[in-house]
Each structure stands twice: as structure tokens, then as C-alpha cells.
From Swiss-Prot:
It is found in: Secreted; Cytoplasmic granule membrane. It comes from the Eukaryota. Residues 28-38 are annotated as: Central sheet, part 1. InterPro entries: Bactericidal_perm-incr_a/b_dom, BPI/LBP, BPI/LBP/Plunc, Lipid-bd_serum_glycop_C, Lipid-bd_serum_glycop_N. GO terms for molecular function: lipid binding; lipopolysaccharide binding. This is Bactericidal permeability-increasing protein. CDD domains: BPI1, BPI2. Residues 37-219 are annotated as: N-terminal barrel. GO terms for biological process: defense response to bacterium; defense response to Gram-negative bacterium; immune response; innate immune response; lipopolysaccharide-mediated signaling pathway; negative regulation of interleukin-6 production; negative regulation of interleukin-8 production; negative regulation of macrophage activation. Belongs to the BPI/LBP/Plunc superfamily. BPI/LBP family. The lineage of its organism: Eukaryota, Metazoa, Chordata, Craniata, Vertebrata. Residues 463-482 are annotated as: Central sheet, part 3. The gene is Bpi.
Length: 482
């Protein structure tokens, strides 16, 4: 995390179907794993059916006409026109897992209702009216193949589609001669059945390419965190399906927006057990968090400048030379009642560990102290090394990962002084006070804004729960459309 000082760079705000990355190590293990269970696919299916149903209701049925011959009446002509789909009922749609192959959309026992106009002509004999067409037992089977393009973005295509119609029944009204149409209803029903049959799979294929593929493209490949860092969520390989879940293996790596440099480590293996009680689960490795620290460190923004103006008037301590009298009297005498500036930084990488007991790290910090002269120039005083232990609590909120850090007491070491040595213990209370009241709140302000998770547009997590495991966090949650 980066700390926003007053005149150092400041912090800024940080298809669904396959929710689910290029480092020096060319790591093939993911830093972030996203899985969707059958329960999650059921949610996806219901959401997808809304759009598919709209497309099916918009089926355009062309007018058709023909000749007929009836004994004793001779030849005549008929025409069916102004046809529109009034209803397309899909009672039990499913998206099934096809191990190693992808997904399968399955629709059975659907029904369609179509209305329109008809007319008949035989010499001077004319008749016309309305008709209702009932199509029962409509089934659709479509196989969906999931892949990834060179950029690591998910792709989805409809590889095969087949539809079947059990029965078609027509009912005419509006004329006493409607019985004529009923005499050759099989011909009409067969013609309409062929028309609908040809259009169903065309619509399914078009919905996948024109609706679903653009939607899954809203799954982020690169997610901006702030003006300093982004997260690489690119797919390392095509999504994998088993009989339990669909899995996307993502790079899961923070990088400095000024330079996407390599991280000198590889992600750990995450042993994630299947759990169908939630729609999705996400394995978030320690690699993910450590690349965040590395990116901010590479950008040289892990520092904060403190001056007295930033402290409250009733603060326990004030940053001026007066409080140095007890351990650096020479400084207090040479620079009476002048301001102090503290530059607190994290020059060394501190590896974050994830264990069943939680997330922890041992930061090594530094504080450089300066006297601020009336002309704003700085006189260096001393350099302190600071060691502490820290813990990190992580939660999920909506579409972000949020956190809060807790710091242990800092232990100080005098590394350098331009005005003689002194007992650093005399400074411990001051430094710990400033860390707890000025520095830590800024860190936690950033952590509360959080980091974006790899979710498609309009989808948030609900009922989320997080577990700490060895080297990774497991996030389980349900999905909600906003």
C-alpha cells in the first residue's frame, strides 16, 4: 500500500459465465484462482435467459402462402401473414458442466405461442381471420466452448446447437370458412415448424456472439487500482471445467503503472477444496498481496512526510525542536523553536505470510528527521531504523477486497546521527504515537477503499466469507446483480 503524504504523491480511489497472466519467472501457477459452482451457473443461467428470451420473442417469421386443392371445390390459395411471437416460455433452463469440454446450455419442454392473420381465396370466394399457433416440446442443446485470446481475455463460442420441436397446433378463427384451413393444417404446421426450427439455433448462436461474448469481455484483464498500480487478471490458460466447477486461473499480479517489472518469486500452489454451497470461490495467494507491496515499493511511494502542521492542535506531541532538548540539546539550542520534518518510509520488502491463523508481516521501516529552516531548506538530523509486527484483516465488500492493518509497537535503532548519539528509547513514545495517529489511519483509509476483484459489470458479491489457509485466502460468496 502507498502512503499519501501532504506534498508527496497522494492516494486516489482505487461474462459472468466464466468468472472466473508476464513475469521474469514466466510463472504458470496462478496468483489468483476463480471458480464458479453449479449453483453459480444456475444463477448465470437465470440471468442469461432474460436476454435470450428477449431475442426469441423477437423472432421474425416471414409471411408464407401456397396453393391447395380440395375435392369438389378445386384449387385455391392461402396466405399467412402479420405473424408475431406472443410468448416463449422456458420452464427449466440449465447450464451444465461438461468436464474438459466447456459448458452446455440445455432447454427442454419450452413452448411458443404465435399469432397472426390468414386469408383464403378461390375465385370470387374469399375468407380471412386470425389464427393462434401453439408450439410445444421445444428443446435446445447448445455447447459452449471457453478459451482465452492472446491478451488473456476470456472467449466464448457456440460450437454446436441443435433444436427439436415435438408438436405444432394451429387454431383459426374469424370466418365460417376457417374449416378450410383446418383441412390442410398439417402442411401449414410443418411449414411453420421448419421456419421456427431454423431460426432458434441462429438466435442462440447470435446471442452468444453478440450478447454474451461482449458481456464476458467486461471481466477485467487489467483492473486499475489507483494512479500508481493496476492488477493483471489475465487468464494463464483457457478456463477449465470439471464435474464440480468451472475454474479460471488468473495471473493475479499487481504492477506499477509506470513500469510493469517482474516480481522475483512464483505463486504458491493453492489446494482449494470444492464447495457447492456458494456460487463462487476465489483463491487469493500471498503472491497477490506481495506483488502489491512490490509495485508500490518500485514506484517509490511507500513513504509519508510529517510536519507539525499536520498534527492536531491538541496533539500529545508537536514536531518542533523544543521536544529535542532532553536528548539532543545541541540541536534545540542551535535551531530554537524551529519545525521538524519526519520522512517515514519502507525501503525494504517485507514478505506477507498467509497461514491458517491469519495474515502477518514484519515491516522494516525508516524515519529520517530534519530541521526545517525559516527558508524551508532542510538540515538532516538522524536516521532511525524501526521494526514491528503487523497483521492484516481482509474482507470482501460488493466487488472489492478491503482490509485493515494493525501494527505492533515499534522498536527503534539509531542508524545515523549528525549531532551525536542518543538513547532512541526516548523517542519511542513519540514515534509510536505518530504511527498510530497519523500513518496507520492513512494506510487503513487506502485499505478500506479496497482493490477491485475480477467480476463482470453489474455483478457484486453477497454472503461472503473468508478463510485463511496455508499461503492463500479462500473467499466464498454468492452473486447479486445490481
Amino acid at each position: 500500500m502507498a502512503w499519501g503524504p501532504d506534498n508527496v504523491r497522494k492516494w486516489s480511489s482505487l461474462a459472468l459465465l466464466a468468472i472466473v497472466g508476464t513475469a521474469l519467472t514466466a510463472a504458470t501457477d496462478p496468483g489468483f484462482v476463480a471458480r464458479i459452482s453449479q449453483k453459480g451457473l444456475d444463477f448465470v443461467c437465470q440471468e442469461s435467459m432474460v436476454e435470450l428470451q428477449k431475442e426469441l420473442l423477437a423472432i421474425s417469421i416471414p409471411d408464407f402462402s401456397g396453393d391447395f386443392k380440395i375435392k369438389h371445390l378445386g384449387k385455391g390459395t392461402y396466405e399467412f401473414y402479420s405473424m408475431a411471437v406472443e410468448g416463449f416460455h422456458i420452464p427449466d433452463p440449465q447450464i451444465k458442466l461438461l468436464p474438459s469440454d466447456g459448458l452446455q446450455l440445455s432447454i427442454t419442454s419450452a413452448s411458443i405461442k404465435i399469432s397472426g392473420r390468414w386469408k383464403y381465396r378461390k375465385n370470387i370466394l374469399k375468407a380471412s381471420g386470425n389464427f393462434q399457433l401453439s408450439i410445444q416440446g421445444v428443446s435446445i442443446i447448445a455447447d459452449l466452448i471457453l478459451g482465452n485470446d492472446p491478451s488473456g481475455r476470456i472467449t466464448i463460442t457456440c460450437s454446436t446447437c441443435d433444436s427439436h420441436i415435438n408438436s405444432v397446433r394451429i387454431k383459426v378463427s374469424g370466418s365460417m370458412l376457417g374449416w378450410l384451413i383446418q383441412l390442410f393444417h398439417r402442411k401449414i404446421e410443418t411449414s411453420l415448424k421448419k421456419t421456427i426450427y431454423k431460426k432458434i439455433c441462429k438466435i442462440v448462436r447470435n446471442s452468444v456472439s453478440a450478447k454474451l461474448q461482449p458481456y464476458v469481455k467486461t471481466l477485467p484483464v487489467v483492473a486499475k487500482v489507483d494512479d500508481i498500480t493496476s492488477i493483471d487478471y489475465s487468464l494463464l490458460a483457457p478456463p477449465m471445467t470439471t464435474d464440480k466447477f468451472l475454474e479460471g486461473q488468473l495471473r493475479g499480479e499487481f504492477f506499477w503503472r509506470g513500469h510493469h517489472g517482474p516480481f522475483p518469486a512464483v505463486p504458491p500452489v493453492m489446494n482449494i477444496l470444492p464447495n457447492n454451497n456458494y456460487m463462487v470461490c476465489m483463491g487469493i495467494s500471498d503472491y497477490f498481496f506481495n506483488t502489491a507491496e512490490f509495485a508500490y515499493q518500485e514506484s517509490e511511494t511507500l513513504k509519508i512526510t510529517l510536519r507539525d502542521q499536520l498534527l492536531a492542535k491538541d496533539a500529545r506531541y508537536h514536531l518542533n525542536t523544543d521536544f529535542l532538548k532532553t536528548f539532543l540539546p545541541e540541536v534545540a539550542k542551535k535551531f530554537p523553536s524551529m519545525g521538524l520534518q519526519l520522512l517515514i518510509s519502507a525501503p525494504l520488502f517485507a514478505h506477507l505470510n498467509i497461514q491458517p491463523s491469519g495474515l502477518s508481516l514484519s515491516p522494516n521501516l525508516e524515519t529520517r528527521a530534519f530541521v526545517v529552516l525559516p527558508n524551508s531548506s532542510l538540515i538532516p538530523l538522524f536516521l532511525l531504523g524501526m521494526k514491528t509486527n503487523a497483521s492484516l484483516e481482509v474482507n470482501a465488500m460488493k466487488n472489492r477486497l478491503i482490509g485493515e492493518m494493525k501494527l505492533g509497537r515499534l522498536l527503534l535503532e539509531l542508524k545515523q546521527s549528525n549531532f551525536g548519539s542518543f538513547k532512541v528509547e526516548l523517542l519511542e513514545d513519540v514515534i509510536n504515537y505518530l504511527m498510530s495517529t497519523m500513518v496507520l489511519p492513512k494506510i487503513n483509509e487506502k485499505l478500506r477503499r479496497g482493490f477491485p476483484l475480477p467480476l463482470p459489470a453489474g455483478i457484486q458479491l453477497i454472503n461472503s466469507i473468508l478463510y485463511s489457509s496455508q499461503n492463500f485466502l479462500l473467499l466464498e460468496a454468492d452473486l447479486h446483480r445490481t
